[in-house]
Amino acid sequence: MSTPKPDARTRLLDAGMQLLRERGYDATRVEDLCTAAGVTKGAFFHHFASKADYGVAAAQHWTDTTAPMFAAADYHAAPTPLARIFAYLDLRRAMIAGAPAQFSCVAGMMAQEVFETQPAISDACGASIAGHAATLEADFAAAIAEHGLGDVVHAADLALH
């Protein structure tokens, strides 16, 4: 039995995960996305009012597709908060192999490119990044408390950076 093909919107968003990392937001044309997704330009505009709307959706799609991988990652099994933080950093280090387009963060890349020109995309990327950082805050807070550093650093700040 064959696996059902994702709908056109999902195929467009999936195509963007690679194209946006290879070319950047500005250099990725609607036509390129359509070709990669195997859909027409009309299908693109059926699902997205503009390329900017696509950019906002792409940031959310990045979150939706990467969050389960991070949630299931082995670093959560480390025995202490500090060990989990170091295991997370080890995971991130292991992820940065090969060409940048293979491992770079779509939200981070787009945020850097469009922060002055596309506020809606910039905000969506910021929400994606902050949302991921929030998943690390509890371990940072516990490690800070465990090591008596509460007056020196803040969990949310460390998680975001």
Question: What do these predicted ranges mean?
Answer:
Residues 64-67, 83-87, 100-102, 116-145:
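Amphipathic alpha-helical packing segments from all-alpha helical-bundle domains
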Residues 57, 71-103, 155-161:
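Hydrophobic alpha-helical connector segments
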Residues 48, 109-117:
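Short helix-capping/turn signature of helix-turn-helix
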Residues 1-7, 144-147:
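N-terminal intrinsically disordered/low-complexity leader segments
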Residues 11, 15-53, 57:
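Helix-turn-helix
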Residues 26-27, 148-156:
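Short, charged helix-capping/linker segments at alpha-helix termini
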